[in-house]
Design a protein with these regions (language model features):
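An N-terminal assembly and electron-transfer interface module characteristic of large anaerobic redox
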Residues: 1-136
Length: 136
């Protein structure tokens, strides 16, 4: 089983993943059917969210970072968390405003994700790895 961390949103902090030496990849959720998603989630979930659930199940993905960019991703997180199959599942709330309070909360949320990445990868954060990814 791969230790690759998958992500479903362009707002995922890839430099942070790189800083912890994580292998990561974007999901490419193109599903031929939604049989799994329709068994484990509400039928009215959008097609993209169903495709994410299908890809996770069909590909055996066990490490995923989601963001709260839309309500459907919150439901995907709920379904995957309830499944008990995920080794690493994180939800990163992305702020929709830029106020001192939202910036402070986002900093705490990034710290929580960083702590989880450190536990999952077993590595310390390396700023050079993060920077190398950022400038590539």
């Amino acid at each position: 089983m791969s230790k690759t961390i998958y992500y479903a949103c362009k707002y995922a902090p890839l430099e942070l993943f790189a800083g912890y030496g994580a292998t990561f990849s974007a999901l490419d959720p193109l599903a031929e059917s939604f049989s799994c998603a329709e068994r484990c989630a509400h039928a009215n979930l959008c097609g993209y969210a169903k495709a994410v659930l299908e890809q996770v199940e069909q590909s055996g993905i066990r490490a995923l970072v989601l963001t709260n960019c839309c309500d459907a991703m919150l439901r995907v997180y709920d379904v995957l968390a309830a499944s008990g199959k995920m080794e690493f599942l994180q939800l990163l709330p992305v702020p929709h405003q830029s106020t001192p309070a939202t910036r402070a909360r986002f900093a705490r949320d990034l710290r929580r994700l960083a702590d989880a990445l450190q536990r999952y990868t077993g590595q310390e954060f390396d700023a050079q790895r993060a920077h190398a990814f950022f400038v590539h």
